[in-house]
Amino acid sequence: MLGCTPHISREQSGDLAAMSSVLLEHPAGDIPQSSWPEAVANLKPKRVYRTDEGVYICTYELFIEERGVFIPDPASSFMPGRNGDPSYDVVAPGVFTYRSAG
């Protein structure tokens, strides 16, 4: 199942970091597909949503399990880490992959 976590290239992570402020402007909740920047749409997400912690770009969903890319909100005190649910892995500054077992 590890293959379900998206592989993000250096170029993709740079593109995502560059447009993160656009996504972070949205209020909490689902971000409509019509508002997805090209860098997000290229990941072919199932859904994109905003929380107080940041933006989740869900690329895999099965029942309660979810995986994808996370862009933290720099205004939040949230610190993504590997030891929790969801767990986070750093891809580049300001860009993480995440996995939630539910």
Language-model segments: residues:
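N-terminal export/targeting and maturation segments
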Residues: 4-52
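Short, solvent-exposed recognition patches
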Residues: 37-102
